[in-house]
Design a protein with these regions (language model features):
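C-terminal cap/substrate-recognition subdomain and adjoining C-terminal extension
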Residues: 6-10, 14-152
Length: 152
């Protein structure tokens, strides 16, 4: 039942996720906030799990994979386009369009990722950063001379 799932999620966020969020990660988010940058998390992980994490970081906007719900319960299916690989770019463009923005007209963009799955998104931005990168992304970052940071 959804009520139990909600309780388990809250406990997981409190006991597991919150302690994993490092001071360095919070400081990085705050540095962008101080520059008045628009903060957005784009993740392939489902929004049900990631929204509370975005809330912990004080980030209002989140694009995640949405879960289908019927009568307040999850069906086990995805709703809409998953935000995975190229789907992240499509979802980002839709999010921007809803706000009257066009990606190519943005003056400066920062993308942080740990996964090779995000290489298309990183290549699209003006300031790609590999954060705790997997092996493939690390090699790509070195080849492209992208910054590599570690937040754990």
């Amino acid at each position: 039942p959804r009520k139990l799932l909600d309780e388990l999620r809250s406990e997981y966020i409190k006991k597991i996720i919150n302690p994993m969020i490092t001071k360095e990660a919070k400081d990085l988010v705050d540095s962008h906030r101080k520059e008045n940058h628009k903060l957005l998390i784009i993740t392939a992980t489902n929004s049900y799990i990631t929204k509370p994490i975005a809330d912990l970081l004080g980030i209002e906007d989140l694009i995640g994979t949405d879960l289908e719900e019927v009568n307040g319960e999850f069906t086990g299916k995805v709703s809409g386009l998953p935000s995975f690989q190229e789907g992240k770019i499509t979802r980002l463009n839709l999010w921007l369009e809803e706000r009257g923005l066009i990606f190519e007209e943005l003056e400066k963009t920062f993308f942080y990722s740990d996964s090779m799955n995000d290489i298309p998104l990183l290549e699209k931005g003006s300031n790609p950063v590999a954060a705790n990168p997997d092996e493939v992304l690390e090699k790509k970052a070195i080849k492209e001379d992208w910054p590599i940071i570690y937040l754990r």
